[in-house]
Amino acid sequence: MIKTQQRLITEFQKNDREMLKVQIQTFRGQEYVDIRAWIKDESSGEYKATPKGLPIHVELLSELMAALEKAALVLDGARH
């Protein structure tokens, strides 16, 4: 069995049933930033991970951050 280590960075509510979690995961010796949707289980009230997510290798993190900053600038410009 392969162990995955997880460290929660932040989580925030997306809507009444879903939250997004940002975690650092180590899998087979490689580190990833995992951004994933978690959905509330109606019977237990606990949140469970969904397949909807994006594991990002740490080497690509700076590129993703730059792309998100560009998207924010475009959206900000569209609002003014």
What would you call each of these model-derived segments?
Residues 1-16:
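Negatively charged, low-complexity tracts enriched in Asp/Glu with abundant Ser/Thr
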Residues 2-3, 18, 29, 58:
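Low-complexity, intrinsically disordered regions enriched in charged/polar residues
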Residues 6-7, 24, 70:
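Intrinsic disorder/low-complexity segments enriched in polar/small residues
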Residues 11-14, 29, 41, 56:
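Generic structural "secondary-structure junction" signal
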Residues 19-52:
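A short, structured beta-strand/loop element
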Residues 50-80:
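Mixed-charge, Lys/Arg-enriched low-complexity segments
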